[in-house]
Amino acid sequence: MAFHKPEQIAELVIEAGVQKVSQTLPAMLILGFLGGAFISLGFLLNIRVLGNLPERWGSLVNVLGGAVFPVGLMLVVLAGGELITGNMMSLSMALYAKKITLVSVLNNWVWITFMNFVGAIFVAYCFGHLGGLTEGDYLNKTVAIAEGKLHESFGRTLILAIGCNWLVCLALWLAYGTSDFVGKIIGIWIPIMAFVVIGFQQVVANMFVISAVIFAGHLTWMDLARNFVPVFIGNVIGGAGFVGFAYFACYQKQHSNMK
């Protein structure tokens, strides 16, 4: 199993950021939809597991649910998809390296965020609502998860979102660190399970679960909008700052000197 050094990973992430802004609009839209749908499918799997577990199991319930959630990001990385939270890291690093412009970054972020939302809505409505997978016996659990995302203050929600994308982007960083299929799965699985068990907030996952509850007749689109703002900002800080800027500052200059 081959591993890249951190300075090599930094270069790979920057190259990925350049490639992402070079995609055609149709490709960007399709991959953005898939990214949102894949993350939502991972969350749907999480809900189906949690809904059958007794509450008396305590924290073990969250661990088991968190163990299956990473399927979503595995599909994004291994099958192909664009996820806004990952792009917050890769495009920011390419911007820091002066390989792309701020306009191209914002253009990508807007389209990918929108299409991630479309993908999340698709899974929430078609599979969650029409298919009944987040309703019936699973509705109480779905509502509890969604309401848990909404009861925190703006500031606390933002902080929880920072922690989330710190771990999500570390998962992607580890995935860039190896070309081995199994290595990528392991690298993704551990940090993503951690963010779910801890209770951090990820903007695309929240799009799915809150929308599912809206379609079931609970909550409103304004609830989703109020949650979106602090979570998106926090995810940007976690991805572009705590991972992207931190590793660019430490490794990119060193790698450039080596070349």
Swiss-Prot record:
UniProt protein name: Formate channel BtFdhC
Superkingdom:
Bacteria
For membrane topology, the record states:
Multi-pass membrane protein
Q: Which GO terms describe its cellular component?
A: plasma membrane
User: Where mainly located?
Assistant: membrane
Work out whether the entry's keyword set contains Chaperone.
Answer: no
Ranges that cross the membrane:
27-47, 67-97, 109-130, 158-176, 188-216, 228-250
One MF annotation (Gene Ontology) recorded for this entry: formate transmembrane transporter activity
Function recorded in the entry: Acts as a formate transporter.
Name the chemical reaction catalysed here. formate(in) = formate(out)
Q: Coiled-coil ranges per the record? A: none
Xref: InterPro entries = Aquaporin-like, For/NO2_transpt, For/NO2_transpt_CS
Recorded family membership: Belongs to the FNT transporter (TC 1.A.16) family.
Cite the Pfam families for this sequence: Form_Nir_trans (PF01226)
PROSITE patterns tied to this protein: FORMATE_NITRITE_TP_1, FORMATE_NITRITE_TP_2
Q: Reply yes or no: does the keyword Iron-sulfur apply.
A: no
Compartments in which it is found: Cell inner membrane
PANTHER family to which the protein is assigned, alphabetical: FORMATE TRANSPORTER-RELATED (PTHR30520), FORMATE_NITRATE FAMILY TRANSPORTER (EUROFUNG) (PTHR30520:SF6)
Keywords of the record: Cell inner membrane, Cell membrane, Membrane, Transmembrane, Transmembrane helix, Transport
- Topology, Cytoplasmic side: 1-26, 98-108, 177-187, 251-259
Ranges in the topological domain labelled Periplasmic: 48-66, 131-157, 217-227
